[in-house]
């Protein structure tokens, strides 16, 4: 049986970590989709990245799967996917899931706080 830390370690090996400055530079690119996987309460308290999809970690499989009624049409396998959470752990796990679902260009951009500190655009 694997521990949570083992799963996280495997996810971190599978999903490249993109530094926040590089992520901010990609913001607004038509080829890039940013997903905030924190829950609604966390986003309500801190805001999120401007234009980010708000898809909670527990719903990502449905939003990413084009065969479900819950598919988010912005989720396309030819897009570059940047995933953010509070500190990077949920983003890594989400990235692993997306890669296993066939999304090739998936990056963990860490936590929203780092994005905000780097001057990345935000919204309520």
Predicted regions and their residues:
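Rhodanese-like catalytic fold shared by cysteine-dependent sulfurtransferases
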Residues: 1-32, 40-80, 89-124
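Active-site flanking residues adjacent to catalytic metal/cofactor-binding acidic residues
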Residues: 35
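Short, surface-exposed ligand- or partner-binding patches at beta-edge/loop junctions that are enriched
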Residues: 84
